[in-house]
């Protein structure tokens, strides 16, 4: 018996595991470690120097250095020199890193609701209201939920 070929509109759950394209698994290979996400949080807040990132995250220097190297190799952050003698670098988000902003907001929102008793911060939109991140289709404006998403093979 052979596995069914993906067809337009097929739901991912209907595909055998080996046939599922898994961008999520690939993203988790880059981002899925605690210290990576916490380092990205700090860099996104404007903390660019290694010692300050280590201080705010609580990561050991060895672990943080490893995670920053991996994030740089994946193109999520870049190092920029700020001192020649001794040579020192700052860390900045690349375009790929900046595009993680909505992902981080969604994780904050989930954590505020499900992972802590009382959130440490209230995030507000520029309109003054507490931030509520929703996902909507950019084409039709309708909410995106697990039952409104259909997958089809990417065109070659």
Residue locations for each model-derived region?
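C-terminal regulatory/oligomerization modules of transcriptional regulators
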Residues: 1-8, 109-156
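Alpha-helical linker/hinge and terminal dimerization helices associated
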Residues: 37, 74, 103-114
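Short aromatic/hydrophobic contact patches that present stacked aromatics
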Residues: 56, 90-92, 122
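Canonical helix-turn-helix DNA-binding module
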Residues: 50-82, 86
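N-terminal leader segment of winged-helix/HTH proteins
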Residues: 1-31
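N-terminal helix-turn-helix DNA-binding core of bacterial DNA-binding proteins
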Residues: 22-63
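Basic, Lys/Arg-rich alpha-helical nucleic-acid-recognition elements, primarily the DNA-binding modules
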Residues: 1-5, 39-42, 52, 71
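Basic, amphipathic "hinge/linker" alpha-helix immediately C-terminal to the N-terminal HTH DNA-binding motif
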Residues: 32, 83-106
